[in-house]
Design a protein with these regions (language model features):
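Short, flexible loop/hinge motifs at secondary-structure junctions
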Residues: 1-169, 242, 248, 292
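Catalytic center-proximal scaffold of phosphoryl-transfer enzymes
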Residues: 30, 38, 91, 107, ...
Length: 488
């Protein structure tokens, strides 16, 4: 409240009822101004909530409101399709030894004079033009009948029947068909009913819903040991990209965690989103660098061992820049620094900068970010202040990429690994039992890890099922030599 426009001597000369009247209205004005400030803050919060979209929050694009701004790239001015100088793609002709059937077409008459054409003439004929058509064969299941022929024992005076070989067991389905069921479910995200229909329509095999579930559970058992081995290897990883998303077991809330490492991609379904679930995934002895967002469970790992995802921070600063308070300039400044950071990183990825040069160019960005966060921590906007103070606490985790080779500015690897699982969840609504949860973990881990290493999925799963049926252990998912993460 500003001071009165007159001095105490004037105040003392006023009639007694006038100062009393002024004091009443001054108090009313103070209360009104306080209420206005409170309502303005409330309006800003509601507007920020109304304006939330995938560009300024963690909200997925599928939940964006109609008025959300479209993230459109600037037009390049080029025509769509192949550009001048682009080397086109075409199908290479298969070698003759791989051709199943050859059909020769001969011209019989000349299109100009209608004369009969001669074949095998002495003249040099032009080169034979070849055109190949690729087709799928009609699939018929191979049905193998195993007959158990009893023999008579003259000593015991009884018939003796043989046992089925261990690799056959009592299953009505072979390892390859079983592997198809597991892969159609876990890799191609088909529901149990869709798998039944696909096998019937494409392969001519009738399988019941109950058999589909039994085959998935048996495959899960076959993959149990390699899955556990890959999961235990996370603790020895030098870098791990970790994220989590919601999952369901019947009507119960569950969480699907993922850890992408140099050697493998591990999935784990847990009952919580807390620290205990994180330690179950990465192990208590984890000493590498953890890529993550700012979810509280990750604080169990020291900041010097973390790299916060700058894609998440970019959305946070975008939200601050849209606030009609003192947070706006803080958010705009943060966006400028993030743009500089990504520009430097992209130049490093393109080979224009060495790692040492990238570190050097990040020094001024790091200094400006520190200044920004210190100013934002006392800017007068509670939202911006809380965010900046939180980032100051996590300061060692903001630019770990400048001190550790192999560290990236975003957690995109983990988020990309979860996308297929999210689509599967939306199509199948989660799992209905604990066995289903274990199958989800193991088949997702197996498929993602094999794709990461460019290994054949079907061949591995078939071999794992064959080993399981004979009481053996499937081969390891981990490579014999360290592999770098396959570029997505």
């Amino acid at each position: 409240m500003e001071t009165r426009p007159f001095g105490p001597e004037v105040w003392e000369q006023l009639p007694p009822e006038v100062p009393a009247y002024i004091l009443v209205w001054e108090e009313a004005l103070r209360q009104a101004l306080a209420k206005i400030a409170q309502l303005e803050q409330r309006v800003n919060e509601l507007e920020a909530r109304l304006n939330r979209h995938s560009g300024n929050s963690s909200q997925p694009p599928s939940q964006d409101p109609p008025q959300a701004p479209k993230n459109r790239r600037e037009k390049s001015g080029r025509n769509p399709g192949g550009q001048p100088g682009h080397q086109g793609n075409h199908r290479e002709l298969a070698p003759p030894e791989k051709v199943d059937k050859i059909v020769e077409h001969r011209a019989e008459t000349c299109p100009h004079c209608r004369s009969a054409l001669q074949h095998g003439a002495a003249r040099q004929a032009p080169a034979v033009e070849r055109h190949q058509v690729w087709e799928l064969p009609e699939i018929h299941p191979i049905i193998i009948e195993h007959r158990l022929l009893a023999g008579w024992c003259p000593h015991c005076q009884s018939w003796v029947k043989p046992e089925l070989p261990a690799e056959i067991g009592r299953s009505a389905f072979g390892p390859r068909l079983q592997a198809w069921v597991a892969i159609l479910t876990g890799r191609f995200r088909q529901s149990r009913r869709q798998v039944v229909e696909l096998l019937r329509e494409l392969c001519g095999v009738n399988v019941s819903l109950g058999s589909i579930q039994s085959l998935c559970e048996e495959t899960s058992e076959a993959l149990a040991v390699p899955y556990q081995e890959a999961k235990e290897a996370v603790a020895q990883a030098d870098v791990a990209f970790v994220d989590e998303t919601g999952w369901k077991e019947q009507a119960k809330r569950r969480w699907l965690w993922v850890a992408v490492t140099r050697w493998a991609t591990i999935f784990k379904v847990s009952c919580s989103r807390g620290r205990k679930a994180l330690l179950e995934l990465i192990g208590e002895s984890f000493e590498g660098i953890l890529h993550s967002d700012r979810w509280g469970a990750y604080n169990i790992v020291a900041s010097r061992q973390r790299q916060i995802c700058w894609a998440h921070l970019q959305r946070d600063f975008q939200a601050l820049s849209e606030r009609k308070t003192r947070a706006g300039p803080v958010g705009a400044w943060g966006l400028r620094e993030i743009k500089r950071l990504f520009a430097i990183w992209h130049r490093y990825q393109a080979g224009e900068l060495t790692w040492a040069e990238m570190r050097w160019e990040l020094v001024p960005v790091r200094l400006r970010l520190g200044k920004l966060l210190r100013q934002g921590a006392c800017c007068g906007d509670s939202k911006a202040e809380a965010r900046c103070r939180n980032l100051l606490k996590l300061w060692p985790a903001l630019l770990t990429l400048a001190f550790m080779p192999g560290v990236e500015p975003t957690n995109n690897r983990a988020e990309r690994a979860l996308r297929g699982a999210v689509l599967w969840r939306k199509g199948c609504f989660g799992n209905q039992s604990d066995n289903g949860l274990r199958f989800t973990e193991r088949i997702l881990t197996t498929v993602a890890t094999l794709r990461q290493q460019d290994r054949t999925i079907v061949a591995y799963v078939v071999a794992a099922i064959q080993a399981h049926r004979t009481g053996q252990v499937a081969s390891s998912l981990l490579p014999t030599a360290p592999l770098f993460i396959k570029a997505a």
